[in-house]
Amino acid sequence: MTAIIDIVGREILDSRGNPTVEVDVVLEDGSMGRAAVPSGASTGAHEAVELRDGGARYLGKGVLKAVEAVNGELFEAIGGMEAENQIHIDQTMIELDGTPNKSRLGANAILGVSLAVAKAAADAAGLPLYRYVGGTKAHILPVPMMNIINGGAHADNPIDFQEFMILPVGAPTLREGVRWGSEIFHTLRKKLKDAGHNTNVGDEGGFAPNLKSAPVALDFIMESIEKAGFKPGEEIALGLDCAATEFFKDGNYVYEGEKKTRDPKAQAKYLAKLAADYPIVSIEDGLAEDDWEGWKYLTDLIGKKTQLVGDDLFVTNTARLRDGIRMGVANSILVKVNQIGSLTETLDAVETAHKAGYTAVMSHRSGETEDSTIADLAVATNCGQIKTGSLSRSDRMAKYNQLIRIEEELGKQARYAGKSVIKG
């Protein structure tokens, strides 16, 4: 009854107005799954490859080749298979592509089909996606890591770090955590406006003010937390995504906004000082993606008390993650479905992390759609943390709203991760 009888790929637009792939999978019993694929701005060199068309159309960013792969080769390969055989379906598509980074058919094509298959199978089983993927143990609502000030590749301002996040760790529920975040976000808007800064938002819905350095941004956030009536460190923790690969040049970290250059050890010490001066509990990509020595130094320096998340470092890839585990580098992995390109490999990455005592953070991309799959996957994997942007833009709100629905549906079984995500 769950045999795949039709697959339809199409080109739609993401939150930046760029093309992306959407896929519908239809089963023999009439069940259907639909998935839209996200896209990143600051992409790691080791990520699976999005297939783009090139040429003049959409300034080279069209995805008709990927759509053609969905409707052609991929449908021919998995048509007739049972949708609940997710691992077999994903493996078939990966082998059909035949490259180590999915560059022939495109990770955007393979992922679209992979996620749509899972959604169709969940529909056939009469289950929500989080329950279908995670089983009866899926019950933990993640702490949102809310990116309320944007910099780096996500904004047109001098701030070198890409994201400044608030984590409502002291909230009793996910729903309340979202409320706390919203109140701080709107308080920050007023503080920035009163200080003469613009309150335009970046790709992920956070503000992109013309601030010179990380401490200045952090001070604005700390003041906004207190003004909104919350206690920094106790109720609201802070997180950073440095996206350090973006400003790593010739072996050094070049801060254009601060007009400073730091070598890897100085970079690690700078991050350690920020973590000591502010209630920062999580730092993502504090060092560049191939600066393994710098990563090791940072991990030895503050890894016992601070979550150190590898995004560009690990790119949701179990092989790179295992390298990091073996070397004692970082202690957490950022999980982005389109970095690796299939649901099976995504779940493998989370499982590998958890088995090694590493945390996992489910994440959006800067180019998103109304698709809320990652909200379900965060609950399905009980990973306890999610990055899905700020408290504006409907492409970000779609994920928060889905989490609110899931928490309501779980009722008394629901547990908000809260302070359990904090190390040390």
From Swiss-Prot:
Q: Which PROSITE patterns match?
A: ENOLASE (PS00164)
Q: Which reaction does it catalyse?
A: (2R)-2-phosphoglycerate = phosphoenolpyruvate + H2O
Tell me the compartments it is located in: Cytoplasm; Secreted; Cell surface
Q: What is this enzyme's class at the first EC digit? A: lyase
Q: Which residues form a coiled coil?
A: none
Which EC number(s) are documented for this chain? 4.2.1.11
Which metal ions or organic cofactors does this protein require, according to UniProt?
A: Mg(2+)
Which GO molecular function entries does the Swiss-Prot or TrEMBL record give? magnesium ion binding; phosphopyruvate hydratase activity
Q: Where does Mg(2+) bind?
A: 241, 284, 311
Name the InterPro entries on file. Answer: Enolase, Enolase-like_C_sf, Enolase-like_N, Enolase_C, Enolase_CS, Enolase_N
Show the active-site residues. 204, 336
Organism superkingdom: Bacteria
Its pathway, per UniProt, is: Carbohydrate degradation; glycolysis; pyruvate from D-glyceraldehyde 3-phosphate: step 4/5
Q: Name one GO biological process term.
A: glycolytic process
- What does the UniProt cofactor note say? Binds a second Mg(2+) ion via substrate during catalysis.
**Entry keyword Secreted:** yes
The record ties this protein, via Pfam families, to: Enolase_C, Enolase_N
What UniProt keywords apply to this chain's record, in alphabetical order? Cytoplasm, Glycolysis, Lyase, Magnesium, Metal-binding, Secreted
> What Gene Ontology cellular-component terms does the record carry?
cell surface; extracellular region; phosphopyruvate hydratase complex
Q: Where does (2R)-2-phosphoglycerate bind?
A: 162, 336, 365-366, 387
Q: Which family does it belong to?
A: Belongs to the enolase family.
Functional description taken from the UniProt entry: Catalyzes the reversible conversion of 2-phosphoglycerate (2-PG) into phosphoenolpyruvate (PEP). It is essential for the degradation of carbohydrates via glycolysis.
Please give the name of this protein: Enolase
Gene giving rise to this polypeptide: eno
